[in-house]
């Protein structure tokens, strides 16, 4: 069953995976990926988050996100899509 996340602007994203209920990989309706991170209370901060420390939950998250995406690219290429520019 597909799950979706709607932001305050009414934009709809498909939830591809979640890790520890703290971070989600979302896919926009036009195919772009967004990482959303739980901020506080009941709000999600969506954006292209990049963590230089790829250990712990973030390492697990990107591994699961890569597997869930089904992208035909190598893992390092995949995580580069999330580097902040």
Predicted regions and their residues:
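Intrinsically disordered, low-complexity regions of eukaryotic proteins
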Residues: 13-16, 24, 55, 76
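Compositionally biased, intrinsically disordered low-complexity segments
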Residues: 18, 26, 82-85
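Short aromatic-glycine-(Arg/Gly/Cys) micro-motifs in beta-strand/loop hairpins
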Residues: 20-48, 64
